[in-house]
Amino acid sequence: MSHGHSHGGGGCRCAAEREEPPEQRGLAYGLYLRIDLERLQCLNESREGSGRGVFKPWEERTDRSKFVESDADEELLFNIPFTGNVKLKGIIIMGEDDDSHPSEMRLYKNIPQMSFDDTEREPDQTFSLNRDLTGELEYATKISRFSNVYHLSIHISKNFGADTTKVFYIGLRGEWTELRRHEVTICNYEASANPADHRVHQVTPQTHFIS
């Protein structure tokens, strides 16, 4: 079955096709633990703060009491600051079983406070989405473009024809790198970390926060 495609590299696969057993599958989508939720923004959400609720444990993805719906039109823009540097490997987008499900996702890296006007620029990667009602379809990023990310913007630009868009879950898979205390600016954070200077974690819900 076709799972959609991406422009500029990457693709889509079932989470069930991943090598780890089902009980371990949710551990891979632990980057939500590394989001600075207090600073996360969702533009054009109909209910203030609802966009934060879709970044949750993979095991809770089917909880439909938490969702975000767009307001004025079908577009949503998530501005996602991380607490360190991230190597983003894959994304899951779960929606409703109707035309409100997102049909296109555009990714931008390291543009804090991004606005809808900023989405006129070329995205780092664009995906055509299939309907995913169970949180099983992963869209693989082009890792060479997303290996040094401190801020991610997800632009839901289209749905399948409804007036508004609904999203129930966004899963992020990848690795998180701790920033050193004396790092002056994240922008200068080297792409190839020296293991002696940094600790790299495959993020899982069991990982402790570094304060």
Curated annotation (Swiss-Prot):
The modification Phosphotyrosine is found at Y189. Residues 20-192 form the PITH domain. One of its GO terms (cellular component) is nucleus. Down-regulated in primary acute myeloid leukemia (AML) patients. It is found in: Cytoplasm. Signal peptide: none annotated. Its main location: cytoplasm. GO terms for biological process: penetration of cumulus oophorus; penetration of zona pellucida; positive regulation of DNA-templated transcription; positive regulation of megakaryocyte differentiation; regulation of proteasomal protein catabolic process; spermatid development. Pfam families: PITH (PF06201). Induction: Up-regulated in K562 and HEL cells undergoing megakaryocyte differentiation induced by phorbol myristate acetate (PMA). Keywords: Activator, Cytoplasm, Phosphoprotein, Transcription, Transcription regulation. Disulfide bonds: none annotated. The keyword Transcription regulation applies. The keyword Cytoplasm applies. Belongs to the PITHD1 family. Promotes megakaryocyte differentiation by up-regulating RUNX1 expression. Regulates RUNX1 expression by activating the proximal promoter of the RUNX1 gene and by enhancing the translation activity of an internal ribosome entry site (IRES) element in the RUNX1 gene. This is PITH domain-containing protein 1. It comes from Homo sapiens.
